[in-house]
Amino acid sequence: MKRIAVDAMGGDHAPQAVVEGVNQALAAFPDIEIQLYGDEAKIKQYLTATERVSIVHTTEKINSDDEPVKAIRRKKEASMVLATKAVKDGQADAVLSAGNTGALLAAGVFVVGRIKNIDRPGLMSTLPTMDGKGFDMMDLGANAENIAHHLYQYGILGSFYAEHVRGVKQPRVGLLNNGTEDTKGTPVHQEAYKLLAEDKSINFIGNVEARELLNSVADVVVTDGFTGNAVLKTIEGTAKSIVGQLTGSIKNGGLRAKLGGLLVKPTLKKALGAMDYKTAGGAVLLGLKAPVIKAHGSSDAQSIFYTIKQTRSILEAGIVEKSVAKFSVVEESHD
Protein backbone atom coordinates (compact mmCIF):
# COMPACT_ATOMS: atom_id res chain seq x y z
CA MET A 1 0.00 0.00 0.00
CA LYS A 2 1.37 3.40 -1.02
CA ARG A 3 0.74 5.98 1.71
CA ILE A 4 0.41 9.59 0.55
CA ALA A 5 0.13 12.54 2.94
CA VAL A 6 -1.91 15.34 1.36
CA ASP A 7 -2.06 18.96 2.49
CA ALA A 8 -5.80 19.54 2.11
CA MET A 9 -5.57 23.27 2.84
CA GLY A 10 -2.99 24.22 0.21
CA GLY A 11 -3.96 25.86 -3.09
CA ASP A 12 -6.37 28.44 -4.45
CA HIS A 13 -9.36 26.07 -4.42
CA ALA A 14 -8.65 24.14 -1.22
CA PRO A 15 -10.00 22.15 0.40
CA GLN A 16 -12.74 21.38 -2.16
CA ALA A 17 -10.55 20.75 -5.21
CA VAL A 18 -8.01 18.78 -3.18
CA VAL A 19 -10.57 16.51 -1.51
CA GLU A 20 -12.53 15.94 -4.72
CA GLY A 21 -9.29 14.96 -6.46
CA VAL A 22 -8.57 12.56 -3.60
CA ASN A 23 -12.04 11.00 -4.01
CA GLN A 24 -11.28 10.33 -7.69
CA ALA A 25 -7.84 8.89 -6.97
CA LEU A 26 -9.06 6.52 -4.26
CA ALA A 27 -11.71 5.20 -6.65
CA ALA A 28 -9.14 4.69 -9.42
CA PHE A 29 -6.19 3.21 -7.48
CA PRO A 30 -6.87 0.44 -4.94
CA ASP A 31 -3.22 0.36 -3.82
CA ILE A 32 -3.05 3.87 -2.32
CA GLU A 33 -3.91 5.19 1.12
CA ILE A 34 -4.49 8.92 1.62
CA GLN A 35 -3.91 10.91 4.80
CA LEU A 36 -5.63 14.31 4.60
CA TYR A 37 -4.18 17.09 6.76
CA GLY A 38 -6.37 20.11 7.46
CA ASP A 39 -9.60 21.42 8.94
CA GLU A 40 -11.61 18.25 9.58
CA ALA A 41 -15.04 19.90 9.34
CA LYS A 42 -14.23 21.52 6.00
CA ILE A 43 -12.68 18.34 4.60
CA LYS A 44 -15.73 16.26 5.53
CA GLN A 45 -17.96 18.55 3.45
CA TYR A 46 -16.39 17.16 0.27
CA LEU A 47 -15.05 13.73 1.25
CA THR A 48 -17.14 10.90 -0.20
CA ALA A 49 -14.55 8.12 -0.02
CA THR A 50 -14.82 5.95 3.09
CA GLU A 51 -11.98 3.45 2.71
CA ARG A 52 -8.19 3.92 2.73
CA VAL A 53 -8.52 7.54 3.80
CA SER A 54 -7.99 9.28 7.13
CA ILE A 55 -8.16 12.87 8.35
CA VAL A 56 -5.60 14.49 10.63
CA HIS A 57 -7.16 17.66 12.01
CA THR A 58 -4.90 20.71 11.97
CA THR A 59 -5.48 24.13 13.48
CA GLU A 60 -3.18 26.14 11.21
CA LYS A 61 -2.35 26.52 7.54
CA ILE A 62 0.46 28.21 5.64
CA ASN A 63 -0.78 31.06 3.46
CA SER A 64 0.54 32.00 0.03
CA ASP A 65 2.07 35.24 1.34
CA ASP A 66 3.81 33.69 4.37
CA GLU A 67 7.61 33.85 4.44
CA PRO A 68 8.58 30.21 3.74
CA VAL A 69 11.22 29.36 6.34
CA LYS A 70 9.56 31.39 9.12
CA ALA A 71 6.20 29.77 8.34
CA ILE A 72 7.39 26.18 8.73
CA ARG A 73 9.22 27.05 11.94
CA ARG A 74 6.45 29.08 13.58
CA LYS A 75 3.37 27.24 12.33
CA LYS A 76 4.28 23.81 13.64
CA GLU A 77 0.64 22.66 13.55
CA ALA A 78 0.06 23.75 9.94
CA SER A 79 -1.35 21.15 7.54
CA MET A 80 1.71 21.30 5.26
CA VAL A 81 4.18 20.95 8.14
CA LEU A 82 2.38 17.99 9.72
CA ALA A 83 1.97 16.25 6.35
CA THR A 84 5.70 16.61 5.71
CA LYS A 85 6.54 15.45 9.23
CA ALA A 86 4.45 12.31 8.64
CA VAL A 87 6.87 11.37 5.87
CA LYS A 88 9.90 12.01 8.06
CA ASP A 89 8.40 9.89 10.86
CA GLY A 90 7.64 6.99 8.50
CA GLN A 91 3.86 7.35 8.71
CA ALA A 92 3.61 8.24 5.00
CA ASP A 93 5.72 7.49 1.92
CA ALA A 94 5.24 10.79 0.05
CA VAL A 95 3.77 14.25 0.57
CA LEU A 96 1.71 16.37 -1.81
CA SER A 97 0.66 20.03 -1.53
CA ALA A 98 -0.70 22.76 -3.79
CA GLY A 99 0.23 25.40 -1.22
CA ASN A 100 3.07 27.90 -0.78
CA THR A 101 5.91 26.66 -3.03
CA GLY A 102 8.73 28.16 -0.98
CA ALA A 103 7.36 26.72 2.25
CA LEU A 104 7.03 23.25 0.73
CA LEU A 105 10.60 23.41 -0.59
CA ALA A 106 11.84 24.49 2.83
CA ALA A 107 9.85 21.74 4.55
CA GLY A 108 11.21 19.22 2.08
CA VAL A 109 14.83 20.16 2.73
CA PHE A 110 14.65 20.79 6.49
CA VAL A 111 12.05 18.20 7.52
CA VAL A 112 12.32 15.34 5.00
CA GLY A 113 16.04 15.91 4.36
CA ARG A 114 18.47 15.50 1.47
CA ILE A 115 19.80 12.25 0.11
CA LYS A 116 23.46 11.87 1.09
CA ASN A 117 25.90 13.33 -1.49
CA ILE A 118 23.26 15.42 -3.27
CA ASP A 119 24.31 19.06 -3.03
CA ARG A 120 21.05 20.88 -3.79
CA PRO A 121 17.66 19.25 -4.40
CA GLY A 122 16.02 20.62 -7.54
CA LEU A 123 12.43 21.21 -8.62
CA MET A 124 11.46 19.25 -11.71
CA SER A 125 8.30 19.21 -13.79
CA THR A 126 7.16 17.50 -16.97
CA LEU A 127 6.35 20.22 -19.48
CA PRO A 128 4.27 19.77 -22.66
CA THR A 129 5.63 19.44 -26.20
CA MET A 130 3.89 19.71 -29.55
CA ASP A 131 4.02 15.93 -30.10
CA GLY A 132 2.40 15.26 -26.71
CA LYS A 133 5.39 13.37 -25.27
CA GLY A 134 6.61 16.13 -22.95
CA PHE A 135 10.03 16.76 -21.42
CA ASP A 136 11.37 16.99 -17.88
CA MET A 137 13.05 20.22 -16.81
CA MET A 138 14.98 21.10 -13.67
CA ASP A 139 15.72 23.22 -11.70
CA LEU A 140 12.49 25.26 -11.91
CA GLY A 141 13.19 27.59 -9.01
CA ALA A 142 14.23 25.66 -5.92
CA ASN A 143 17.59 27.45 -6.12
CA ALA A 144 18.22 30.96 -7.43
CA GLU A 145 21.86 30.15 -8.17
CA ASN A 146 23.59 26.90 -9.09
CA ILE A 147 27.14 25.72 -9.66
CA ALA A 148 28.17 23.28 -12.38
CA HIS A 149 28.09 20.25 -10.06
CA HIS A 150 24.45 20.97 -9.19
CA LEU A 151 23.53 20.94 -12.89
CA TYR A 152 25.42 17.69 -13.37
CA GLN A 153 23.47 16.09 -10.52
CA TYR A 154 20.22 17.37 -12.02
CA GLY A 155 21.13 15.55 -15.22
CA ILE A 156 21.37 12.30 -13.27
CA LEU A 157 18.17 12.86 -11.28
CA GLY A 158 16.18 14.00 -14.32
CA SER A 159 17.39 11.04 -16.36
CA PHE A 160 16.33 8.67 -13.57
CA TYR A 161 12.86 10.21 -13.47
CA ALA A 162 12.34 10.16 -17.24
CA GLU A 163 13.43 6.54 -17.50
CA HIS A 164 11.75 5.00 -14.46
CA VAL A 165 8.60 7.11 -14.05
CA ARG A 166 7.79 8.19 -17.61
CA GLY A 167 9.22 5.07 -19.27
CA VAL A 168 11.61 6.87 -21.65
CA LYS A 169 14.40 4.55 -22.78
CA GLN A 170 17.85 6.17 -22.69
CA PRO A 171 16.42 9.66 -22.13
CA ARG A 172 18.22 12.42 -24.02
CA VAL A 173 19.64 14.96 -21.57
CA GLY A 174 20.28 18.50 -22.80
CA LEU A 175 21.86 21.52 -21.10
CA LEU A 176 19.90 24.73 -21.67
CA ASN A 177 22.26 27.31 -23.15
CA ASN A 178 22.42 30.29 -25.51
CA GLY A 179 23.80 28.17 -28.35
CA THR A 180 24.48 24.55 -29.23
CA GLU A 181 28.28 24.75 -29.44
CA ASP A 182 30.16 23.25 -26.47
CA THR A 183 32.00 26.56 -25.92
CA LYS A 184 28.78 28.54 -25.38
CA GLY A 185 27.55 29.96 -22.10
CA THR A 186 29.08 31.05 -18.82
CA PRO A 187 31.96 29.22 -17.10
CA VAL A 188 29.29 27.39 -15.06
CA HIS A 189 27.63 26.13 -18.26
CA GLN A 190 30.95 25.09 -19.78
CA GLU A 191 31.97 23.16 -16.67
CA ALA A 192 28.52 21.53 -16.41
CA TYR A 193 28.80 20.51 -20.07
CA LYS A 194 32.13 18.82 -19.35
CA LEU A 195 30.79 16.93 -16.31
CA LEU A 196 27.68 15.72 -18.15
CA ALA A 197 29.68 14.65 -21.21
CA GLU A 198 32.17 12.66 -19.11
CA ASP A 199 29.47 10.58 -17.36
CA LYS A 200 28.70 7.76 -19.79
CA SER A 201 25.69 6.64 -17.74
CA ILE A 202 23.92 9.78 -19.02
CA ASN A 203 22.73 10.05 -22.62
CA PHE A 204 23.97 13.64 -22.90
CA ILE A 205 23.20 15.27 -26.26
CA GLY A 206 24.87 18.62 -25.58
CA ASN A 207 23.52 22.15 -25.38
CA VAL A 208 19.92 22.92 -26.35
CA GLU A 209 18.28 26.27 -27.04
CA ALA A 210 15.04 27.55 -25.51
CA ARG A 211 13.35 27.98 -28.89
CA GLU A 212 13.50 24.19 -29.47
CA LEU A 213 12.15 23.05 -26.10
CA LEU A 214 8.55 22.52 -27.25
CA ASN A 215 9.75 20.56 -30.29
CA SER A 216 11.02 17.60 -28.22
CA VAL A 217 14.69 18.45 -28.66
CA ALA A 218 15.43 16.56 -25.41
CA ASP A 219 13.68 14.34 -22.87
CA VAL A 220 15.40 16.04 -19.93
CA VAL A 221 16.55 19.68 -19.88
CA VAL A 222 18.96 20.85 -17.20
CA THR A 223 19.23 24.49 -16.12
CA ASP A 224 19.73 26.72 -13.09
CA GLY A 225 16.70 27.58 -10.96
CA PHE A 226 16.44 31.24 -11.98
CA THR A 227 16.48 30.49 -15.71
CA GLY A 228 14.24 27.45 -15.34
CA ASN A 229 11.57 29.39 -13.48
CA ALA A 230 11.64 32.16 -16.10
CA VAL A 231 11.29 29.61 -18.92
CA LEU A 232 8.42 27.84 -17.14
CA LYS A 233 6.46 31.08 -16.70
CA THR A 234 7.18 32.12 -20.28
CA ILE A 235 5.77 28.83 -21.60
CA GLU A 236 2.67 29.13 -19.38
CA GLY A 237 2.11 32.76 -20.32
CA THR A 238 2.61 32.19 -24.04
CA ALA A 239 0.19 29.26 -24.06
CA LYS A 240 -2.49 31.32 -22.27
CA SER A 241 -1.98 34.27 -24.63
CA ILE A 242 -2.28 32.12 -27.76
CA VAL A 243 -5.44 30.42 -26.51
CA GLY A 244 -6.93 33.77 -25.51
CA GLN A 245 -6.09 35.34 -28.85
CA LEU A 246 -7.55 32.43 -30.84
CA THR A 247 -10.79 32.25 -28.89
CA GLY A 248 -11.14 36.04 -28.93
CA SER A 249 -10.62 36.22 -32.69
CA ILE A 250 -13.24 33.53 -33.31
CA LYS A 251 -15.73 35.02 -30.84
CA ASN A 252 -15.44 38.58 -32.16
CA GLY A 253 -14.78 37.84 -35.82
CA GLY A 254 -18.31 37.56 -37.12
CA LEU A 255 -20.16 34.67 -38.76
CA ARG A 256 -17.32 33.63 -41.08
CA ALA A 257 -14.86 33.40 -38.18
CA LYS A 258 -17.34 31.39 -36.10
CA LEU A 259 -17.94 28.94 -38.96
CA GLY A 260 -14.19 28.61 -39.45
CA GLY A 261 -13.82 28.03 -35.73
CA LEU A 262 -16.28 25.14 -35.88
CA LEU A 263 -14.32 23.56 -38.74
CA VAL A 264 -10.96 23.73 -36.99
CA LYS A 265 -12.30 22.94 -33.51
CA PRO A 266 -11.26 19.22 -33.51
CA THR A 267 -7.74 20.09 -34.68
CA LEU A 268 -7.42 22.92 -32.18
CA LYS A 269 -8.70 20.73 -29.37
CA LYS A 270 -6.11 18.07 -30.19
CA ALA A 271 -3.27 20.61 -30.35
CA LEU A 272 -4.29 22.32 -27.12
CA GLY A 273 -4.72 18.94 -25.43
CA ALA A 274 -1.09 18.13 -26.18
CA MET A 275 -0.08 21.35 -24.43
CA ASP A 276 -2.31 20.84 -21.37
CA TYR A 277 -0.21 20.77 -18.18
CA LYS A 278 -3.02 19.36 -16.00
CA THR A 279 -2.45 15.73 -16.96
CA ALA A 280 1.31 15.92 -16.34
CA GLY A 281 0.93 16.17 -12.57
CA GLY A 282 2.93 18.41 -10.28
CA ALA A 283 6.53 19.48 -9.80
CA VAL A 284 8.79 17.07 -7.92
CA LEU A 285 11.53 18.12 -5.51
CA LEU A 286 14.15 15.56 -6.49
CA GLY A 287 17.10 14.73 -4.27
CA LEU A 288 15.18 14.23 -1.01
CA LYS A 289 14.79 11.13 1.15
CA ALA A 290 11.12 10.84 0.10
CA PRO A 291 9.00 12.22 -2.76
CA VAL A 292 7.78 15.79 -2.16
CA ILE A 293 5.29 16.85 -4.84
CA LYS A 294 4.10 20.40 -5.53
CA ALA A 295 0.75 20.63 -7.33
CA HIS A 296 -0.06 23.83 -9.22
CA GLY A 297 -1.54 26.51 -6.94
CA SER A 298 -4.61 26.83 -9.16
CA SER A 299 -5.17 23.06 -9.34
CA ASP A 300 -8.72 21.81 -9.78
CA ALA A 301 -9.88 18.30 -8.83
CA GLN A 302 -8.63 16.84 -12.12
CA SER A 303 -5.14 18.29 -11.58
CA ILE A 304 -5.01 16.88 -8.05
CA PHE A 305 -6.08 13.47 -9.36
CA TYR A 306 -3.26 13.43 -11.92
CA THR A 307 -0.75 14.62 -9.33
CA ILE A 308 -1.73 11.74 -7.03
CA LYS A 309 -1.42 9.39 -10.01
CA GLN A 310 2.07 10.79 -10.63
CA THR A 311 3.01 10.37 -6.95
CA ARG A 312 1.86 6.76 -7.08
CA SER A 313 4.07 6.16 -10.15
CA ILE A 314 7.07 7.74 -8.41
CA LEU A 315 6.63 5.44 -5.41
CA GLU A 316 6.11 2.42 -7.65
CA ALA A 317 9.31 3.20 -9.57
CA GLY A 318 11.40 3.48 -6.40
CA ILE A 319 13.08 6.69 -7.54
CA VAL A 320 14.38 7.58 -4.07
CA GLU A 321 15.94 4.16 -3.54
CA LYS A 322 17.56 4.24 -6.99
CA SER A 323 18.88 7.76 -6.36
CA VAL A 324 20.41 6.73 -3.02
CA ALA A 325 22.18 3.79 -4.69
CA LYS A 326 23.37 5.88 -7.64
CA PHE A 327 24.78 8.75 -5.59
CA SER A 328 26.62 6.48 -3.19
CA VAL A 329 28.41 4.99 -6.23
CA VAL A 330 28.97 8.40 -7.86
CA GLU A 331 30.53 9.81 -4.69
CA GLU A 332 32.79 6.78 -4.23
CA SER A 333 34.08 7.17 -7.80
CA HIS A 334 34.96 10.81 -7.05
CA ASP A 335 36.83 10.00 -3.81
From Swiss-Prot:
One of the protein's GO biological processes: phospholipid biosynthetic process
Chief location bin: cytoplasm
Pathway in which the depicted protein is active: Lipid metabolism; phospholipid metabolism
GO molecular function: phosphate:acyl-[acyl carrier protein] acyltransferase activity
Highest taxon above the source species: Bacteria
Disulfide bonds: none
Assembly and interaction partners: Homodimer. Probably interacts with PlsY.
Job of this protein: Catalyzes the reversible formation of acyl-phosphate (acyl-PO(4)) from acyl-[acyl-carrier-protein] (acyl-ACP). This enzyme utilizes acyl-ACP as fatty acyl donor, but not acyl-CoA.
Homology family: Belongs to the PlsX family.
Protein name: Phosphate acyltransferase
Organism: Streptococcus suis (strain 05ZYH33)
